A protein has these predicted regions:
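Conserved phosphate-binding/catalytic loop of the ribokinase/pfkB sugar-kinase fold
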Residues: 108-114, 121-156
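Conserved phosphate/ATP/ADP-binding segment of small-molecule kinases
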Residues: 169-267
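A short, aliphatic-rich alpha-helical micro-motif
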Residues: 20, 156-157, 200-204
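Substrate-binding N-lobe of the ribokinase-like
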Residues: 2-14, 46, 50-117, 332
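Short acidic, glycine-rich surface-loop motifs adjacent to enzyme active sites
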Residues: 158-171
Length: 339
């Protein structure tokens, strides 16, 4: 399939995007504070063969599952994130960035025994040079999982879609997944998962997972078993749907676009919509946020995937943890070639 739209598809997609503003999405996952250190490099250190960064400024953004929430908000939807932060300096900074970005803070669970996850990226001359991670990845306590579930119970009736964002920082555990999926099915809410490779066996019964190519193959090996010969990607997609009882699997393929497998037998190959790629960090968050919004606004899964592909094409053309706006997405639909 070429990356083109018919006139009727354009009208349909524009109607879906216009519907984002009434959508409510519950986002559960690992909260991360993203720190960006911006500077210039003009010399090598005399102490060791490493560049010296002359720091010009620093910025902070809500990351992890909060980047999904931020993408939803940027696209005019309403996000209700739930996750864990520490009672520390970075936790306070994270809450401040959430409020600054207009992200709801009612789902925060505080844990004084854990540090707030901080990812520091050093960027010079538009290039990321190094990243530092400060975190604790052990499982979140059962007491705090129950606090998350209490929030889910309070909110799920009024939500349109549930997104589970698994960064492997301790929130996503089998108990939590089972309870959330059970509640979502009770109230007929789709559940979308941005997966962690090592946790694929947790995702049984969700609506859709959105792995990248590496995660799809790693998840296949974890849930189905090792292979003697590397299987084709289509075999991986169908096997995951069958094994995990999914409605669909959307595999993101970087510069090769995406491929969607649907339980009923449909395969949709979607070429990349990106014109230029500056930074792929956060693109997966944009994809799952846009799919959630589109489904809630009445899209079919293959339509949601194509709209999400356009949104991802916008954010990879920006540096840093970026988002797309409804205006940018609307323009991308209008700009798409005709067929």
């Amino acid at each position: 399939m070429k990356n083109t739209l018919t006139a009727s598809e354009k009208r349909r997609f524009l109607d879906i995007i216009a519907g984002f503003r009434t959508v409510k999405i519950l986002v559960i996952g690992d909260f991360i504070l993203d720190q960006f250190v911006w500077g210039n490099v003009s010399r090598i250190s005399p102490e060791a063969p490493v560049p010296v960064v002359d720091v010009k400024r620093e910025s902070y953004m809500p990351g992890g599952s909060l980047n999904v929430a931020n993408n939803i908000r940027s696209l005019a939807g309403s996000a209700f994130p739930c996750g864990v932060v520490g009672r520390d300096l970075y936790g306070r900074m994270l809450v401040k960035t959430m409020r600054h970005q207009g992200i709801e803070t009612g789902g925060i669970v505080y844990d004084p025994s854990r540090p707030t996850t901080l990812k520091t990226r050093v960027i010079a001359h538009s290039q990321q040079m190094v990243r530092f991670d400060r975190e604790k990845t052990e499982d979140v306590s059962l007491a705090n999982l129950n606090k998350i579930l209490k929030f889910v119970h309070q909110m799920i009736r009024t939500m349109d879609v549930v997104v589970l964002e698994d960064y492997g920082k301790g929130v996503m555990q089998p108990f939590l997944l089972r309870e959330v999926v059970k509640l979502a099915k009770k109230f007929k809410k789709p559940v979308l998962v941005d997966p962690k490779e090592k946790h694929f066996d947790y995702y049984n019964g969700v609506t859709c997972i959105t792995p990248n190519r590496k995660e799809a193959y790693g998840g296949y090996e974890r849930t189905i078993g090792p292979w003697r010969k590397t299987p084709e990607l289509e075999a991986v997609g169908w096997a995951l749907i069958k094994k995990l009882k999914l409605e669909s699997v959307l595999v993101t393929l970087g510069e090769d676009g995406m491929i969607l497998f649907e339980k009923k037998g449909r395969v949709t190959k979607i070429p990349t919509a990106a014109r230029e790629v500056y930074d792929v960090s956060g693109a997966g968050d944009t994809v799952i946020a846009t799919i959630a919004l589109s489904l809630a606004a009445g899209a079919k899964m293959h339509e949601a995937a194509r709209i999400a592909n356009m949104a991802a094409g916008i954010v990879v053309g920006k540096l840093g943890t970026a988002t797309a706006s409804p205006e940018e997405l609307t323009e991308a639909v209008r700009r798409a070639g005709s067929r």
